[in-house]
Regions:
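Helix-turn-helix
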Residues: 11, 15, 19-53, 57
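Short hydrophobic clusters on alpha-helical segments that form packing/core surfaces
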Residues: 12-20, 28, 62, 66, ...
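Alpha-helical DNA-contacting segments of helix-turn-helix folds
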Residues: 20, 55-62, 69, 106, ...
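Hydrophobic alpha-helical connector segments
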Residues: 71-101, 120-124, 147
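Amphipathic alpha-helical packing segments from all-alpha helical-bundle domains
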Residues: 83, 107, 111-137, 141-146, ...
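Amphipathic alpha-helical segments used for helix-helix packing
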Residues: 93-114, 156-164
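C-terminal peripheral helix-coil segments that are non-catalytic and often amphipathic
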Residues: 129-137, 160-211
Length: 211
């Protein structure tokens, strides 16, 4: 890597992402990044507090990458809400498989708020919007967390080669379909409740009119 003309957070993130893609979180250190940037380790502390701060910066950058990958996949064709969620789920798994070491950084602990929380929040809102179109608004947050947990679990199993003939990867389709049934059921229940409220409101209006 060439020596940066200006040492800033962007240069540190770029070097950190290269290191992360090659060695993963275990190989990540401020000293290694300083060596890649050809600067003294102390120079980094003007821009990065410590290793945890560095991990949060890189997790935010990984969020940007996976968000872009998901959005490209969704925008590639016109899809129904269910197809869009299926495409998102498949692309999430693809990213986790093809960029395993980057994916490891996606869920590092991070405090709420701050500049490094913006990208993960945007990724969350993107997924929430897709899920809401399937699950309805009432159960949207629960449904989004549920599919996130499912995908992360499957990605984690995939990363350790846990799937075989007895534990087939086709269980991904089984689990995703189960989520679809639950999400659709939540939306239908919400729609039924809304129709019930409209019907009750209509009856009350008729009673008032007849008085």
């Amino acid at each position: 890597m060439s020596h940066p003309s200006k040492l800033d957070r962007a240069a540190i993130v770029a070097a950190g992402m290269e290191l992360l893609a090659r060695d993963g979180l275990r190989g990540l250190s401020l000293r290694a990044i300083a060596a890649a940037l050809e600067v003294a380790p102390n120079a980094l502390y003007h821009h990065v507090k410590d290793r945890k701060d560095l991990e949060r910066m890189l997790a935010a950058e990984v969020s940007v990458l996976i968000h872009a990958a998901l959005r490209r996949k969704i925008n590639s064709t016109t899809r129904s809400p269910e197809d869009a969620v299926r495409a998102m789920a498949a692309e999430y798994m693809t990213f986790a498989r093809e960029h395993r070491l980057l994916y490891e950084a996606l869920l590092v602990p991070r405090p709420a708020g701050g500049a490094d929380a913006i990208a993960p929040e945007q990724l969350w809102l993107f997924a929430l919007d897709l899920v809401t179109q399937v699950s309805g608004k009432v159960a949207a947050h629960e449904a989004t967390v549920a599919i996130w947990a499912f995908l992360h679990g499957m990605a984690s199993l995939q990363s350790v080669n846990a799937f075989d003939d007895e534990k087939p990867f086709s269980s991904f389709d089984f689990g995703l379909q189960a989520w679809m049934w639950a999400a659709n059921a939540a939306r239908l229940a919400e729609e039924d409740a809304a129709r019930g409220r409209v019907k009750v409101a209509g009856k009350r209006a008729a009673v008032r009119h007849n008085r």
